[in-house]
Amino acid sequence: MSFKLKILTPTTGFNRTGYTTSLVRLVMYFAQNRIYPECGEQTIDYRTIEGSGISSNRELLIQEFLESDATHVLFIDEDMGFDPRTLHIVAGRRQPIVGCNYPMRVPGAGFTALAKDRKARIITNEQSYGIEPAFYTGFGFCLIERQVFEKIQRPWFLIGFNTSTRYYTTEDAAFAHMVNEAGIPWYVDHDASKGICHIGNFNYWWNETIQKPIITSESTEWEKA
């Protein structure tokens, strides 16, 4: 079998150092370790589009993805830091969509992942492990099989308006409704989520301990600020 990956990052042009360092280390780990034991071929490619229209740029990136022979797409946002093994963890679940859970970039605002019934946010804590069905996780670090985009029609990433909250929705919400209607499961990976941070004024981790990255020539280590 083959695992042909495209990493896609729609960017505003402000890629964080933590994102860049994490991406380099992920690619190095990918080059040295098989995704699956039976994988005879694995390749990796990277594409980005810079601009303020994140929703439309996601759409363009997926169009290009579908014109290739890639089997999987990995969305990574420009403000994410991650362990180099994170891709292997989510890919190892062998599910159509597996994403990571991470705190929003506001202290106390909670996690991005929304429960399947859409009544509460999913919490990742010390007791959380494995994967859990979700309505969506967000696209901060999210692996999606090619077949998902072949089963649902464009537009994939519409911006909507919630008449109850009086707020505009993000593009992942529209995508989540489409995959849910198509019967495609979306999972949050709690194990992978514990290697993810959301980079803002501070690095927001799953346990919401404010931490800062210490980058060395050999590895990335984390210490409390």
Language-model features and meaning:
Residues M1-G51, S56:
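N-proximal low-complexity "stem/linker" segments adjacent to membrane-targeting elements
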Residues I54-R58, A120, D172:
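Conserved donor sugar-nucleotide recognition element shared by glycan-biosynthetic enzymes
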Residues I62, D83-F161:
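Conserved catalytic core of nucleotide-sugar-dependent glycosyltransferases
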Residues A70-G81:
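Short beta-strand-to-loop acidic/aromatic patch adjacent to the donor-nucleotide binding site
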Residues Y19, K151-A225:
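C-terminal catalytic/acceptor-binding lobe
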Residues E59-H72:
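Active-site nucleotide-sugar/metal-binding loop of Leloir-type enzymes
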Residues G40, A91, V179-N180:
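Anion (oxyanion) recognition and catalysis
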